[in-house]
Structures are given as structure tokens and as C-alpha cells.
Amino acid sequence: AARMVDAQAPALGTRLTELADVGDRSPDWARALTAELGTIHLIVRAWQEREHLPADLVAAVHQQLGLSVRAEAVLAEPEVADHWVVTGSQDRGEGRVVARHSWLYGRRTGRWARIIAYAREREELPRIYTAGTQVEARLHFYPGVSLRALSQQEYPSTGAVTDWSPAPLPIVGAREAWRDAVAADPWADARPAIVVGRLATDDGGRLALTDGSAMLPLTGGPCRHR
């Protein structure tokens, strides 16, 4: 793991470090370990074959390795101006750094975006993107299909969400959106979706969401992004 960090591939180094904790996180540790090793192998093979991959997939490989993208390069991408509803956020520990992932939905464009803010342990993260509010911002998206974006303004204007009635997806539609996301990026670990349904339990007694025609399992516990 340390060698990966030295090689400027910190995200891959983090994956290798986390392998030691798989047994503590999952009772089915052997299966989880095999799956993670398979993911790492796929990243390595994709890097070796990067010259033959489409640009979006190469960008996804760079992200999985943790190769940095200069802010100037991101801000050179076309801007997307909108009133963005902050639908949710999650704080994740990444070594000695805490990362806050905030999911934004553009009211005009219907686009999703993910803003990531970082702070060292014991430092306070900025509270710009608070769930249940909206921000007026011009975003620039990172290369690839990860939905990660960067705002032109360090402190965009914020306000309450008013007169917003989003059109939810049926559960089948949410599943199709996830399928398309994984097809475009095999390492995708989360995609936001607004769905309609009610709580239920599946045949195994696990909590799920149903709209009467399909069911979506609800899971908890450790994850990279939500």
C-alpha cells in the first residue's frame, strides 16, 4: 500500500490497506476479500490496457488509482449553471482525511452532480452543501462519468428549496439507471436516484422499498459513497 502511495496511486493504496479489515467488516469475509481482489485486478488490467480504452473509461481508471486532476483543467470544462438541490451527503474517513460527498440535483437541467470536500481529522468540514437546501452555482464536471463536479464559486449562494416537485423514477427505472452506470464505469459504487415506494420486506426478511411492481433492497453499513 505504501508503494502505491509513493507511486502517486493513493486510492489503490487505500484499497490495499482496507483489505486487512475485511474480516472485521463482513462475516462473509472470504467472498468479500475475493471480490475486492478481483476489483483491484480489474483496475490494474485496465491501466495496462489504457491505450485501447475510450476516454471516459480511462478517466474512471485514473479516479480509481487516485491520480489527481488539476482544478484548472476541470474549470476549463464547459460550465453547467443551475439551481442545485442538495439531496443528501455523507462523510467518509479516508486515512487521516475526512471526505464529505454531497449529491446535488439540477432543477433546470435534471443533472446529478457530486461535490467532494476534504478536511484533515479534527478539522471542521465546510457546511456549504447542506441536505434540504439549494445552491445557485456554475459547476464544471470532471472528465469521465463519475458525476464529480467542481464549483466556480467557493461559497455559492444558498437558500431553501421551494416549489420543487421532482419526478421520481419507478424502481425498474432506478435499476436500469444503475445498470447503465456500471456499464459505463465498472467501478461505480453509487448513483443517486429519486424513487417512489413504500417500505416492505423481501423473501429473506430484509428491508426493501417496493412500488407494487418491483422491489429494491435497502442496505446499510460501510460503503465508499452513498
PLM segments and residue spans:
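Long, compositionally biased intrinsically disordered terminal regions
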Residues: 3-8, 14-53, 59-92, 99-101, ...
